[in-house]
C-alpha cells in the first residue's frame, strides 16, 4: 500500500507542468522518470495519462534544448555527452510509442557532434561547467577514440572547433561564441582555447563544485578567468534577457588558413564579487560596448587574435590569456614574451600591438590570492592549482589591437594592423 501511495504522489508531482524544470536537462530526467513509472505500472489509473504527458513534454524539451546543428544548448560539452547517453537509453527503452524515429535522427546528430567534443588528448573540451582532464570515455560510451581532422562549425549553437595535424600530434582551436541561457554558462563570451602539438596552450579554468559563493567557483565562472576581454574588472552579464544565441558572424577556411569572427554588444556588466545565484537585475552596470573578435589561424605557424572594442565612454579593457600550468612565461625581448615548459622547451612567442603600431605592455599573474583570485586552474573540479595569466591593459573609448602567438619564432617581424572603411577591411 505504501508503494502505491508513493507512486500516486509521484504521478501527481511529475504531471504538474509548473514543477518541471523544462529550461534544463533536469526536466528531461524528470520526464524519463515519469515515463518509466507509467510503463512499469500500467495497472495504475494515471499510467496512460502519465505516459502521454511525459512523451509530449520530452518532445517539447528536445526542441528547446538542442540547436538544429546538433549542439546541446547548455554551453558544456560534458552535458552534451551526458545527453547523448541519456537519449540513447531512452530510445532503446521502447517506451516512446512511435517517437523513436525522430529521436533516432536527433541522437545520430548529437553523436556526430559528440565526436568533436574531445581535445587533442581525448579529454572533454572544458567549456562552461565541464571539468578539466575528464576522459571522453568516462562520459560517453560510444566514443571511438578518433580525433576528427578539419573544421566543425555549430553556426546556430555558437561554437567552432578546428583540428589540424602536427606530425603525429594535433592542434586544436576552440572558439566559444554561445549564450542561450544561464544553464552552465560562464561569463566567457568569445572565449578561445588552443592546443599546440597536443599540448594545451591557452586553457579554460574549468569548473568547480556547485557552491556558488566560494572564491574558487566564482573565479572559474568569471570573465577574467577566461581567454577573452575583461572590461572595468567586471563580469559579462549572464541574465537571460542579455542572451544572444550564437555570436558567430563569419567563418572562412582554406587549406592554409582559418579566419573566424564573433561579435557581442554589451549593454550591462556585472560585479565579479557577487555569486551568480545571488545576482539581481539591480546589480547590472549599464554600458554600451561593442566587442568584435577576429581569429586568424595558420596551423603550426601562428595564431592571431584581433580585438576591436567600441564605446562612447572610457573603459579599461584587458584581454587575458591563460596558459596551462605546465607552461611558464619569460621575457624574450622588450616586446616579446616566450612560452616555455619546465625543461625549457619553447612553444611560442607572444606580441601585442595596437592599430598605431604601439607595443602594449603586458601584466602577468600566477596563483594570485589577493585582492582577488587570478591565475588558477581547476584540474578536476575540486582543486585549483597555479597557472599563468597574461593580460594587456588598455584604457580608452575605442581600441583595436592584435595579439599574435608565433609558433615558428624565426625572425618574425612585429605585427602590422590597419583598418579601413569603418572596420570593414583589415
Q: Where are the model-predicted features located?
A:
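Carbohydrate-active enzyme catalytic cores, enriched for enzymes
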Residues: 67, 71-202, 207, 395-400, ...
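Aromatic-lined, polymer-binding surfaces characteristic
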Residues: 1-107
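Short, hydrophobic/aromatic alpha-helical segments in well-folded domains
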Residues: 30-33, 190, 305-306
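Secondary-structure boundary elements
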Residues: 43-46, 59-60, 96-97, 167-169, ...
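Short Pro/Gly-enriched beta-strand edge/turn motifs at strand-loop
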Residues: 142-145, 171-178, 211, 271-278, ...
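Short helix/strand-bridging catalytic loops that position acidic/His residues to coordinate divalent metals
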Residues: 70-72, 210-217
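Short, surface-exposed beta-strand-loop junctions and turns on beta-sheet-rich folds
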Residues: 181, 208-210, 310-313
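CBM-like, beta-strand-rich accessory domains located in the C-terminal region of large
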Residues: 24, 214-426
Amino acid at each position: 500500500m505504501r508503494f502505491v501511495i508513493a507512486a500516486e504522489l509521484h504521478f501527481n508531482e511529475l504531471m504538474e507542468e509548473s514543477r518541471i524544470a523544462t529550461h534544463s536537462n533536469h526536466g528531461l530526467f524528470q520526464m524519463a522518470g515519469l515515463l518509466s513509472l507509467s510503463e512499469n505500472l500500467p495497472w495504475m489509473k494515471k499510467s496512460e495519462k502519465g505516459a502521454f504527458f511525459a512523451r509530449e513534454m520530452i518532445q517539447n524539451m528536445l526542441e528547446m534544448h538542442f540547436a538544429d546543428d546538433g549542439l546541446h544548448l547548455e554551453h558544456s560539452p560534458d552535458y552534451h555527452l551526458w545527453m547523448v547517453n541519456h537519449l540513447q537509453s531512452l530510445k532503446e527503452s521502447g517506451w516512446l510509442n512511435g517517437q523513436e524515429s525522430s529521436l533516432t535522427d536527433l541522437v545520430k546528430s548529437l553523436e556526430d557532434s559528440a565526436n568533436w567534443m574531445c581535445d587533442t588528448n581525448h579529454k572533454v573540451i572544458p567549456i562552461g561547467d565541464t571539468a578539466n582532464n575528464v576522459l571522453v570515455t568516462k562520459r560517453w560510451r560510444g566514443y571511438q577514440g578518433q580525433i576528427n581532422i578539419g573544421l566543425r562549425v555549430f553556426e546556430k549553437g555558437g561554437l567552432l572547433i578546428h583540428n589540424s595535424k602536427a606530425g603525429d600530434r594535433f592542434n586544436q582551436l576552440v572558439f566559444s561564441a554561445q549564450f542561450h541561457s544561464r544553464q552552465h554558462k560562464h561569463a566567457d563570451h568569445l572565449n578561445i582555447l588552443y592546443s599546440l602539438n597536443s599540448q594545451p596552450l591557452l586553457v579554460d579554468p574549468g569548473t568547480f563544485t556547485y557552491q556558488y559563493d566560494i572564491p574558487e567557483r566564482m573565479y572559474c565562472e568569471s570573465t577574467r578567468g577566461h581567454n577573452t576581454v575583461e572590461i572595468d574588472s567586471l563580469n559579462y552579464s549572464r541574465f537571460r534577457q542579455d542572451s544572444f544565441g550564437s555570436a558567430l558572424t563569419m567563418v572562412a577556411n582554406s587549406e592554409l588558413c582559418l579566419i573566424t569572427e564573433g561579435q557581442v554588444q554589451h549593454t550591462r556588466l556585472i560585479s565579479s564579487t557577487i555569486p551568480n545565484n545571488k545576482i539581481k537585475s539591480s546589480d547590472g552596470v549599464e554600458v554600451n560596448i561593442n566587442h568584435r573578435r577576429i581569429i586568424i589561424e595558420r596551423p603550426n605557424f601562428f595564431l592571431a587574435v584581433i580585438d576591436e572594442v567600441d564605446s562612447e565612454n572610457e573603459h579599461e579593457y584587458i584581454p587575458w590569456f591563460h596558459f596551462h600550468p605546465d607552461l611558464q612565461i619569460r621575457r624574450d625581448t622588450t616586446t616579446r614574451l616566450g612560452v616555455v615548459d619546465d625543461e625549457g622547451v619553447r612553444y611560442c612567442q607572444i606580441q601585442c600591438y595596437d592599430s598605431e603600431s604601439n607595443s602594449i605592455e603586458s601584466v602577468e599573474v600566477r596563483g594570485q590570492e589577493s585582492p582577488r583570485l587570478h591565475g588558477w586552474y581547476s584540474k578536476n573540479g575540486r582543486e585549483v592549482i597555479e597557472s599563468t595569466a597574461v593580460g594587456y591593459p588598455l584604457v580608452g573609448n575605442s581600441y583595436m589591437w592584435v595579439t599574435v602567438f608565433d609558433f615558428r619564432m624565426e625572425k618574425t617581424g612585429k605585427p602590422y594592423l590597419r583598418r579601413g572603411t569603418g572596420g570593414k577591411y583589415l
